[in-house]
């Protein structure tokens, strides 16, 4: 099971197709601890729809900063089964943030 996080730049900005990112649900405990779960896994429950990149961006930046400031606080939550780890959540979040910065008016959606 995994999360698919979609960014639809073409809804409010022209010239682009959807961008998608995927990550395992095994990292939910780590994402919750960092403050990333609500904006990435459940944006539609926490923001007015349509949810825009600019809506979730501040919370994802804060969660990302939590991850990188204190890695040891999160590495203990690496899944025992080996599916996903701290580094994959950092990379996933960095990639999502780059796309959100590029398309601040894009609609975002999470499929769980």
Task: Place the predicted regions along the sequence by residue.
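Acidic (Asp/Glu-rich) sequence patches and key acidic residues
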Residues: 1-112
């Amino acid at each position: 099971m995994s999360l698919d996080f979609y960014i639809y730049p073409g809804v409010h900005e022209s010239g682009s197709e959807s961008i998608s990112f995927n990550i395992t649900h095994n990292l939910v405990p780590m994402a919750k601890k960092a403050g990333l779960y609500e904006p990435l896994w459940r944006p539609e429950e926490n923001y007015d729809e349509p949810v825009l990149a600019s809506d979730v961006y501040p919370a994802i930046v804060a969660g990302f900063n939590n991850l990188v400031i204190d890695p040891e606080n999160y590495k203990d939550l690496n899944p025992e089964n080996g599916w996903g780890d701290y580094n994959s959540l950092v990379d996933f979040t960095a990639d999502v943030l780059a796309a959100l910065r590029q398309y601040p008016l894009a609609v975002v959606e999470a499929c769980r």
